[in-house]
């Protein structure tokens, strides 16, 4: 129904943005990746997907068509709803997610919020033929478990009172492989406080 919205960012929350279009504020559920790319007051185009439920209409929006496309593929998987799909895309970029699906990396997929081993297997089974293999750029650093600094940063944020989900989202949003644990924590705290 809505392909995209062009408007001004009125407010930003961890996983939602409010976009004002011609005097109407649209609450759009989004991912950490999309939310981290914008600031309050920015003029943006958000690519959207309308979810119709018995008791509500929800808009999910993304800053890139690739992220929207992957979201739509994820919600086509049985037992994956829009919230879980959005959580998965908060944990992984579409390219990284495609690489995990094509390499059948159940372990990596099951680290996303709301995804266990069975769900990861289902994602691989149902999407392995739907993922565009030509656009996937393999980053072989993804396939080693060398994210010790991230895990330490998440643990530190949790010790400061943030939930595991908030901590993981913040660390993912500020991730830079060249940063040490201390710098990741500092950036994540700034991100959580904005």
From Swiss-Prot:
GO terms for cellular component: cytoplasm; Holliday junction helicase complex; Holliday junction resolvase complex. Gene3D superfamilies: 5' to 3' exonuclease, C-terminal subdomain, DNA helicase RuvA subunit, C-terminal domain, Nucleic acid-binding proteins. Residues 151-194 are annotated as: Domain III. CDD domains: UBA_RuvA_C (cd14332). InterPro entries: DNA_helicase_Holl-junc_RuvA_I, Hlx-hairpin-Hlx_DNA-bd_motif, NA-bd_OB-fold, RuvA, RuvA_2-like, RuvA_C, RuvA_C_sf. It comes from the Bacteria. Keywords: Cytoplasm, DNA damage, DNA recombination, DNA repair, DNA-binding. The keyword ATP-binding does not apply. SUPFAM superfamilies: DNA helicase RuvA subunit, C-terminal domain (SSF46929), Nucleic acid-binding proteins (SSF50249), RuvA domain 2-like (SSF47781). Residues 143-151 are annotated as: Flexible linker. One of its GO terms (biological process) is DNA repair. One of its GO terms (molecular function) is four-way junction helicase activity. Residues 64-142 are annotated as: Domain II. Pfam families: HHH_5, RuvA_C, RuvA_N. Residues 1-63 are annotated as: Domain I. Belongs to the RuvA family. The RuvA-RuvB-RuvC complex processes Holliday junction (HJ) DNA during genetic recombination and DNA repair, while the RuvA-RuvB complex plays an important role in the rescue of blocked DNA replication forks via replication fork reversal (RFR). RuvA specifically binds to HJ cruciform DNA, conferring on it an open structure. The RuvB hexamer acts as an ATP-dependent pump, pulling dsDNA into and through the RuvAB complex. HJ branch migration allows RuvC to scan DNA until it finds its consensus sequence, where it cleaves and resolves the cruciform DNA. Homotetramer. Forms an RuvA(8)-RuvB(12)-Holliday junction (HJ) complex. HJ DNA is sandwiched between 2 RuvA tetramers; dsDNA enters through RuvA and exits via RuvB. An RuvB hexamer assembles on each DNA strand where it exits the tetramer. Each RuvB hexamer is contacted by two RuvA subunits (via domain III) on 2 adjacent RuvB subunits; this complex drives branch migration. In the full resolvosome a probable DNA-RuvA(4)-RuvB(12)-RuvC(2) complex forms which resolves the HJ. Has three domains with a flexible linker between the domains II and III and assumes an 'L' shape. Domain III is highly mobile and contacts RuvB. This is Holliday junction branch migration complex subunit RuvA. It comes from Alkaliphilus oremlandii (strain OhILAs) (Clostridium oremlandii (strain OhILAs)). The lineage of its organism: Bacteria, Bacillati, Bacillota, Clostridia, Peptostreptococcales.
């Amino acid at each position: 129904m809505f392909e995209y919205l062009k408007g001004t960012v009125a407010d930003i929350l961890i996983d939602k943005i409010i976009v004002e279009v011609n005097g109407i504020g649209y609450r759009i559920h989004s991912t950490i990746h999309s939310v981290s790319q914008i600031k309050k007051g920015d003029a943006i185009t958000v690519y959207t997907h309308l979810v119709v439920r018995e008791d509500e209409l929800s808009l999910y929006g993304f800053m890139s068509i690739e992220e929207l496309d992957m979201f739509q593929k994820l919600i086509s998987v049985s037992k994956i709803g829009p919230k879980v799909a959005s959580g998965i895309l908060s944990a992984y970029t579409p390219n990284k997610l495609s690489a995990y699906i094509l390499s059948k990396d159940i372990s990596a997929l099951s680290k996303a919020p709301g995804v266990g081993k069975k769900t990861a297997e289902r994602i691989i089974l149902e999407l392995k033929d739907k993922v565009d293999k030509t656009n996937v750029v393999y980053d072989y650093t993804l396939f080693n478990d060398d994210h010790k600094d991230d895990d330490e940063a998440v643990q530190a944020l949790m010790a400061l009172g943030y939930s595991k989900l908030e901590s993981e989202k913040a660390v993912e949003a500020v991730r830079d492989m060249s940063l040490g644990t201390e710098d990741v924590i500092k950036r994540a705290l700034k991100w959580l406080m904005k």
